[in-house]
Amino acid sequence: MAPSATGLVSQLSSKLSVSSSKAAAAAAAAPASSTSSKTANNKQQLDSEQVIALEHATSAHNYAPLPVVLDHGQGALVWDPEGNEYIDCLSAYSAVNQGHCHPRIIKALTEQATKLTLSSRAFYNSRYAPFAEKITTLLGYDMVLPMNTGAEAVETALKLARKWAYMKKRVPEGMARILTVENNFHGRTIGIVSMSTDPSSRVGFGPFLERVGPVLDDVSSPENPIPAHGGPIRYGVIEDLEHALQEVGHETAAFLVEPIQGEAGIVVPPHGYLAQVQELCKKHNVLFICDEIQTGLARTGKMLACSHEEGVRPDIITLGKALSGGVYPVSAVLADKEIMLCIAPGEHGSTYGGNPLGAAVASEALDVILDEDLCGQADRMGKRFRAELQAVADANPDGLLTEVRGKGLLNAIVIDQSKSKKGRSAWQLCLLLKARGLLAKPTHENIIRLAPPLVITDDQLTRAIDIIKNALLEVETIDEIPGDDGAHH
């Protein structure tokens, strides 16, 4: 059984001390000619146990990582400090669609880093404007507003929608609403978690913004519930949004939605839902905002996930994650001029947004998606992936695996712990997958998101499928799960 984080912390000082002593002794014994070696070669690299213990002792505990340490990666593969190889089936939450350390993107980064990294938007720089032209042309919008993180992009879209509502729709000042759906995830800032229905995002963090989210408590009542079922606006249920807009559409600035819910467990709405959303938003003069941060840029087999429905073109889209290929934080908000120009100079911005380094990286990241046909790759690989895992579920209806869902290479499997003869959980299955050479992580306890880099090869995908199939059987027979110290909660 792997030692707990607490036990690892107690071992850390002695291990580091031994490493330092060995390094010092080696340096003293080395010939004089070796003193010109790179400094990095003289440093003793921490092993995985030391890294985990050190992070546990010195970093905030706002994540509960799988007990694996990543040291380097290439394409769909990553390695730990001990040299163990893994197939990455999380892709940093779909940030490395182009694969780890794609050579073209790394080259763009290093070349630009020797020229100019940051100018701020106080001045023009030579890399941002060509990037802006490229992304707006590619996705069919007039303008882009650059930011750094996905949450920043969403916050920017919310501000933009409210400003539009006051300037163009003439909603009374202070009254503009933003509607969302139940189980949404758009980030973790106060503004964004104000819209959340996830207790872990809200408890202990209030008070929250008013007039945002899927709940209409200020106008709903037991006698006249809005929506009609008396709860939050449900994802994929167009009647809920229709009822809400009938009641508050006149003061609603925007409806914000994920084309596929990611953190909720890769929830795909009924086909036609987004087209119906668009129609309702147009009817009530409400902006349709699509959060494509996790789903966009080829992940689902289309450049934008909303494009799986013909004719769907949101008023505003947000992008992030794979916009830089996982190399540098870059995000963006896209809209047409009528909306984008509602924000005037000085009203919104970011020191790093639109910086030349980020623009160079993002521009190359987009080119890689197009040149390597990653949309087609995601579509082909995803269909095969789901078909093979669905066959496992169909062949064993009483087994742990109860559902396979997704689009492209954004997929999830649903695990029913109550069907496990040994009471095994999705977390324990992920520990076993890790021990067998594949990395994935549960969301909402019983769902495992499976989203490898889009550059994964046929052989690697075959290996990933085999590992998952075998682990689903082995988890029910093995007496002890490797690395399971019972610390996860």
Locations of the language-model features?
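N-terminal mitochondrial targeting presequence
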Residues: 1-38
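Conserved N-terminal phosphate-binding loop of PLP-dependent enzymes in the Aspartate aminotransferase
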Residues: 9-12, 34-489
